[in-house]
Design a protein with these regions (language model features):
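Catalytic cores of secreted/periplasmic or lumenal enzymes
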Residues: 104
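Feature responds to low-complexity, polar/acidic, surface-exposed segments characteristic
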Residues: 1-6, 12-39, 45-101, 114-127, ...
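Short intrinsically disordered, low-complexity segments
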Residues: 131-137
Length: 147
C-alpha cells in the first residue's frame, strides 16, 4: 500500500512531536475539519513540508520517495541532527529532482534510506507504508527520539 501525502504528514508529526500549530493553511484542499489538517499545519509551520503549489497541498496523492526524503531531511535538521556522510551512488541519481538531491545523499549516507534491489532510488515512485515506516524508524533511531 502506498502512503498519501497527508498520511505521511501524520506519521512524521506524531513520530517527532510536531503539534499545536497556529498557522492557518492556504491550501484549498485542506479544510480545518479534515483529520489531517493539524498535522499538515504543524509541519508547514515548522518548514518541514510544503504544498505542491502555493494553494494546493496534494491531498489524496501518493507521496513520492524523493518528496518523503526531503521531508525527513528537514525533520532531522529541525531536530538538530547534523549529517556527516553523503552517498550518491544510486544508478538513477540523475533522475532525482534537484530540490531533493541533497536530502537523498544525506539520508543515504546516514543509512536512513536505501535504494531498490536493482541499485536505483526510484525517486518518482510512490513510497509504500513499509518503506515510509522504515525510514521514519531509522531517523528516530539516529536522533535519539523514543522508539
Amino acid at each position: 500500500l502506498n502512503v498519501k501525502r497527508e498520511e505521511a504528514a501524520k506519521m512524521i508529526a506524531n513520530a517527532f512531536g510536531f503539534k499545536n500549530a497556529k498557522q492557518e493553511l492556504s491550501f484549498k484542499d485542506c479544510d480545518k475539519n479534515d483529520w489531517y489538517y493539524d498535522f499538515v499545519s504543524a509541519l508547514t509551520e515548522n518548514g518541514i513540508i510544503t504544498g505542491q503549489s502555493e494553494d494546493r497541498f496534494g491531498v489524496g496523492e501518493n507521496i513520492t520517495r524523493q518528496d518523503l526524503a526531503v521531508i525527513l531531511y528537514r525533520t532531522a535538521e529541525k531536530q538538530g541532527y547534523q549529517f556527516e556522510n553523503e552517498k550518491d551512488d544510486f544508478t538513477d541519481f540523475e533522475r532525482i529532482g534537484d530540490y531533493a538531491k541533497e536530502a537523498v545523499k544525506s539520508l543515504a549516507g546516514a543509512k536512513i534510506i536505501s535504494g531498490m534491489e536493482d541499485g536505483s532510488f526510484a525517486p518518482m515512485e510512490s513510497a509504500t507504508r513499509a518503506q515510509t515506516a522504515k525510514m521514519v524508524y531509522e531517523l528516530m533511531k539516529i536522533i535519539n527520539a523514543e522508539v
